[in-house]
Amino acid sequence: MMRISLFLLTNLAVMVVFGIVLSLTGIQSSSAAGLMIMAGLFGFGGAFVSLLMSKSMALRSVGGEVIEQPRNETERWLLNTVRQQAQQANITMPQVALYHAPDINAFATGARRDASLVAVSTGLLQNMNRDEAEAVIAHEISHIANGDMVTMTLIQGVVNTFVIFISRILAQLAAGFMSSGRDEGESGNGNPLVYFAVSMVLELVFGVLASIITLWFSRHREFHADAGSARLVGREKMIAALQRLKTSYEPQEASSMMAFCINGRNKTFSELFMSHPPLDKRIEALRSGAYLQ
C-alpha cells in the first residue's frame, strides 16, 4: 500500500509540474499529451524491461551461478539460511547464486517477491563469520520483502518520464526560437538539428539531476533493509556485518549493480551521488533504533 501511495503521489506531483510548464510556455495541450504518452512509454518501458530482465542481467554481469544442488557444506548452509529467513519474512524462497569476487558483497534482485534472487560473493563467505553473513543475507531478504526493486522501478519510470518530457518541451521552444523564416502559425519543432541537440543536452543534464532523487531513495531503503536485518537476526549481528564491510576491498561489481548490493562505492565527491549511506551512518542508525520503530 505504501508503495502504491508513493507512486500515486509522485505522479500527481509530476502532473502538477507538467501543467505549470504548459501554462508558462503556452504549448498546446494536444501536442503535449502526445509527447507525455511517448515519454511515459519510453520512461516506464525501459525501467520495467530492466526489472523483468534483472535476474539474468545481474547474473551475467557478475558471472554468477545459481545453486541448484549444494556441492559442499558452505553452499548447504547458504541455502538453508536463505530458506529459513525467507520463511521468517513470509516470502517465497528466492533463488540463491554464488559469484567469484574478492570484495564482501551480496545483492537481491527480481521482478516479484515470489520470483527473486539473492547472490553472494565468495569474498563474503571467505571473510565473514556465520553471524555476519547471516545479517547480510537478512539485509537482502528485507529488500525483497519490502518490495524495493519494484518501488525503485516505479520511481525510475516517473523520473525518466519527467526528464524526457521536460527536455523535449524546452528543446521545442529553443528550436522554435532559433529557427528563421517560419510563418507565424506554422507548427512543428522548429530547426530539427537544434531540437535534437538541445533535447540530448537537456536529457543529460536533467538525467544527472534526476539521479539525485533515485539515489536518495536508494540510500533511504538501505536504512530500512538494515533495520529489517536487525529484526530477523538481531541488531548486533547487523552492526558487526557493517563494521566488517569497512575492511572490504572496493566493490568490483558493475556500476549498474551498485544500488542492489549491500556494499556500495563511497568514492564520490558528494553523498548526493552515493547509492548507499556511509557505513558509519548506517551503524549509528541501528544503534539509535531510528528505523526500528
Curated annotation (Swiss-Prot):
Subcellular location: Cell inner membrane
Entry note: cofactor: Binds 1 zinc ion per subunit.
Cofactor: Zn(2+)
Alphabetized InterPro entries for the sequence: HtpX_protease (IPR050083), Pept_M48_protease_HtpX (IPR022919), Peptidase_M48 (IPR001915)
Enzyme class, first EC level, given as a word: hydrolase
One GO term describing the cellular component: plasma membrane
Listed name of the protein: Protease HtpX
Encoding gene per record: htpX
